[in-house]
């Protein structure tokens, strides 16, 4: 296999890494491997290597050879990950959460095993060894340094845990995300019980972790350069019902402020995704009686 030496953009951390194609990356993934993927929802998920793994699975199946992997993700993903691998019948096991119609059809037809565990428990369960070892971690990055510092893109998920546990790490270096995204993340792994302490986050601006994930650079078997946007969520347009819900919530919060039950400077919020959440946040943003406020979020996405 030809090894290409390239410099990452115009970074001051000029480094020589083994840059490979998506197809070459797929050669590091074997039948029965447990593979962990970065990201949380489609944000931060690998975009091109999963498709190459799917093509490899199809080719192996046509030869009469088995090829399926165990899949571990931070949450649901996009069609380029769950969809591609499901349609290729390349999944033997999937956890913790999914929302892809093709994967759902595969699971409901008993084509793969599925563990619908709460996604907040997955990283700890992996560290405990409950779900077996992680053979390969495939992660999307905005930047990576020669000493093994990986800067995630717009989602993290279980990236720190799978990178620490995996034997091999494949990086998709997505040039669509600027390397200046470094500093946006606050990556922190709590100690496992019985040694766990409180997580000392008291305001959205508190920082307790790192702006990158540090790995053993010897485990990075290759870097695949990409220039791919995140897959967007497909929600139907807001209708009268969802807008009415949004207005009701905004009016309720304004009433609580005026009654003194909420402080005038308001309080931090955390929102889910979907039409109702979009309507609520939209109506809050348009309401002049609601001041600017802080928001907790684990991912940035168009949803």
Identify the function of each model-found stretch.
Residues 1-8:
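Short, small-residue-biased leader/transition segments that mark boundaries at the very start
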Residues 15-303:
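Conserved alpha/beta enzyme-core scaffold
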Residues 5, 13-14:
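Residue-level detector of intrinsically disordered terminal segments
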């Amino acid at each position: 296999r030809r090894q290409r030496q390239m410099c990452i953009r115009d970074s001051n951390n000029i480094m020589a890494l083994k840059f490979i194609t998506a197809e070459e990356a797929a050669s590091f993934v074997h039948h029965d491997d447990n593979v962990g993927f970065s990201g949380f929802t489609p944000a931060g998920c690998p975009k091109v290597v999963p498709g190459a793994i799917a093509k490899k699975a199809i080719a192996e199946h046509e030869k009469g050879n088995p090829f399926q992997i165990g899949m571990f993700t931070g949450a649901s993903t996009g069609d380029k990950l769950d969809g591609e691998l499901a349609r290729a019948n390349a999944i033997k096991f999937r956890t913790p959460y999914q929302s892809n119609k093709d994967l759902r059809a595969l699971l409901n037809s008993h084509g793969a095993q599925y563990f619908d565990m709460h996604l907040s428990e997955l990283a700890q369960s992996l560290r405990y060894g409950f779900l077996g070892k992680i053979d390969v971690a495939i992660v999307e990055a905005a930047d990576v340094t020669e000493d093994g510092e990986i800067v995630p893109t717009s989602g993290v998920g279980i990236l720190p845990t799978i990178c620490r546990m995996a034997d091999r790490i494949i990086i998709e270096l997505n040039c669509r995300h600027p390397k200046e995204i470094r500093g946006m993340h606050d990556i922190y792994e709590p100690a496992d019980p019985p040694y766990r302490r409180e997580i000392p986050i008291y305001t959205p601006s508190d920082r307790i972790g790192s702006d990158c994930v540090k790995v053993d650079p010897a485990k990075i078997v290759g870097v695949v350069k990409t220039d791919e946007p995140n897959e967007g969520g497909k929600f139907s347009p807001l209708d009268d019902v969802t807008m009415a819900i949004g207005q009701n919530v905004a009016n309720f919060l304004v009433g609580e402020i005026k009654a003194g039950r909420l402080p005038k400077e308001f309080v931090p919020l955390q929102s889910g995704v979907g039409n109702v959440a979009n309507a609520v946040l939209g109506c809050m943003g348009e309401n002049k009686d609601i001041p600017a406020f802080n928001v907790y979020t684990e991912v940035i996405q168009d949803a």
